[in-house]
From Swiss-Prot:
Organism: Alkalilimnicola ehrlichii (strain ATCC BAA-1101 / DSM 17681 / MLHE-1)
Keywords: 4Fe-4S, Cytoplasm, Iron, Iron-sulfur, Metal-binding, S-adenosyl-L-methionine, Transferase
Gene3D superfamilies linked to this entry: Aldolase class I
Pathway recorded for this protein: Protein modification; protein lipoylation via endogenous pathway; protein N(6)-(lipoyl)lysine from octanoyl-[acyl-carrier-protein]: step 2/2
Gene expressing this chain: lipA
Protein name per UniProt: Lipoyl synthase
EC code: 2.8.1.8
Length: 331
C-alpha cells in the first residue's frame, strides 16, 4: 500500500478526479461496522431544510464563479441553507482533496502532489468583497504533501482578504501542521481575529475517529502555540458528540482545553455522512447540549455554542459580538 510520510493512504473505494487530482470519494474504504450499524429515523430536532432561496443561490453562484471549495458543501453540512441564505460561507482553501482520511469526514482523500492554486488568495478576497461579509471563516483540507502544510497559503489568504476587505473579521480553522511551531506561528502572525483547530472528540476516541497523523495532544499543542504567540487572539475548538464519549470524558477534554487557553468551544451532533463512515452511537438531546454548554461556561470559557445542528463554523460571527458573551444556546 502506498504511504504518505510513513502513513498508509486509503487506496480502495470509488476513485474520482478532482481538479486533476485522483482521489478516493468520501475519503474512506469499506467499513464492516456499517453493515451492523443500527438504522432508524433521526430525531425530529435533526431534520434540516432542503437548501433553497435567493441568498443560497447567490452564494452558490459566487462560489462557482471563483472556483472556491466550501466546507459547507464538502462536509455535507446540514446548515448550508441557513448560512448561505444569510450571505455567509466558510471558504475551504487548497482544493477539495485531503491527504488524510478521518473516519467521520466525507471529504475526498488523495495525494495532490503539491498542487496549489496560487490565485486563490485573490479569489477568496474578491469573493468576500462580493458577498459583503463582515466575518469570514477560512478552513482547508489537510495538505501533508506541502512542506509547510499550507501555512504560507493560509497567511497569504488572510493578508489578501485584509487588503481588499479591511473591515472584515477573519477566523482560520486550520489543519494541525503536524504540530510544527513555525508553521502555526506563520498563520498566527497574519493576525486573524480567531484561530481554531478542532480536537473533534475525546482522548480515548481520537483513534479510530481521526486519521493516524492527527492526535489529541497534537491539537492541544497547536492551540497552546497559537495562544502563546498572540495572547490577545481568540482560540477555538470543536467536538462532535454521539460517537460513544462519556460525560466524564467531555469534562476532562474541556479541562485540557482550558489548560492551554482555549476561549471558545462548539459542540454538535455527529451524523454519519455515508454507510462507510463511523456509525452514530447515540443522538444527543437538545437538553443535554444545554447542559454541556453550562458546564463549559462554568469552567471559564468565554463562549460555548452547543446544539444538535451546530458545526464548528456555525454562527461564528455572533460569537465575536459583545465581547463573546450573551450568545443564546443553539438548538
Amino acid at each position: 500500500m502506498p504511504t504518505l510520510k510513513g502513513i498508509p493512504v486509503v487506496t480502495s473505494g470509488m476513485k474520482v478526479e478532482r481538479d486533476g487530482v485522483r482521489a478516493i470519494k468520501d475519503g474512506v474504504k469499506h467499513n464492516p461496522r456499517a453493515e451492523a450499524a443500527p438504522r432508524g429515523r433521526k430525531p425530529s430536532w435533526l431534520r434540516a431544510r432542503v437548501p433553497s432561496g435567493e441568498g443560497y443561490q447567490a452564494v452558490r453562484d459566487i462560489v462557482r464563479t471563483h472556483r472556491l471549495s466550501t466546507v459547507c458543501e464538502e462536509s455535507h453540512c446540514p446548515n448550508i441553507g441557513e448560512c448561505w441564505n444569510a450571505g455567509t460561507a466558510t471558504i475551504m482553501l487548497m482544493g477539495a482533496v485531503c491527504t488524510r482520511a478521518c473516519r467521520f469526514c466525507a471529504v475526498d482523500t488523495g495525494n495532490p502532489k503539491g498542487r496549489l492554486d496560487h490565485d486563490e488568495p485573490a479569489h477568496a478576497a474578491d469573493s468576500v468583497r462580493l458577498m459583503g461579509l463582515s466575518y469570514v471563516v477560512l478552513t482547508s483540507v489537510d495538505r501533508d504533501d506541502l512542506e509547510d502544510g499550507g501555512a504560507g497559503h493560509y497567511a497569504a489568504c488572510v493578508n489578501a482578504i485584509r487588503e481588499v476587505n479591511p473591515e472584515t473579521a477573519v477566523e482560520v480553522l486550520t489543519p494541525d501542521f503536524n504540530g510544527v511551531p513555525e508553521h502555526v506561528h506563520r498563520v498566527v502572525d497574519a493576525r486573524p481575529e480567531v484561530f481554531a483547530q478542532n480536537v473533534e472528540t475525546v482522548r480515548r476516541l481520537t483513534h479510530p475517529v481521526r486519521d493516524p497523523r492527527a492526535g489529541y495532544e497534537q491539537t492541544l499543542e497547536v492551540l497552546r502555540l497559537a495562544k502563546a504567540r498572540r495572547p490577545d487572539m481568540l482560540t477555538k475548538t470543536s467536538l462532535m458528540l454521539g460517537l460513544g464519549e462519556r460525560d466524564e470524558e467531555i469534562r476532562e477534554t474541556l479541562e485540557d482545553l482550558r489548560a492551554v487557553g482555549v476561549d471558545i468551544v462548539t459542540f454538535g451532533q455527529y451524523l454519519q455522512p455515508t454507510r462507510n463512515h463511523l456509525p452514530v452511537e447515540r443522538y444527543v438531546s437538545p437538553a443535554e447540549f444545554a447542559d454541556y454548554r453550562r458546564m463549559g461556561l462554568e469552567m471559564g470559557f468565554l463562549e460555548v455554542v452547543a446544539g444538535p445542528m451546530v458545526r464548528s463554523s456555525y454562527r461564528a460571527d455572533k460569537v465575536l459580538e459583545k465581547n463573546n458573551v450573551g450568545l443564546e444556546s443553539a438548538s
